[in-house]
Amino acid sequence: MNAIEEAKKSNYKYLPPIVENYEPSSQIITVIVDCYYGLNYVQQSVQSILDQDYRNVELMLIDNGAEQDVSEYLHNIYVKWNNVALIEFKENQFSWDDIDIRVAICWNVGVLNSKGSIIGHINYDDMLSVNYC
């Protein structure tokens, strides 16, 4: 089975943005961030996306069975900001048994639920430079 089929079958909960505020005349860019641990890095990564000047950014947060502090932070961002979607996995999807398929599940679930015509992914410990989008 390929990673797309695995993603469709995986056990997750999708929470669409509470408030959507997109410019109808501009493309939506979705940035997917999957998170498990490293709250300090997660905060920097997420903030670098929220600080972009381009307003049609959908932030797709993936709680990959995250540690409690990371999970709480992601939920707070989801509730507080416009254009933020949240995907919650009950348990971490990573496995050394099949790294390529397991890692791709989170990313593909994000892609399957995204609104953007342009879709990107960054790791929890990466940051976007100013005006990247």
PLM regions and their residue ranges:
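Acidic donor-binding/catalytic loop of UDP-sugar-dependent glycosyltransferases
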Residues: 68-69, 126-133
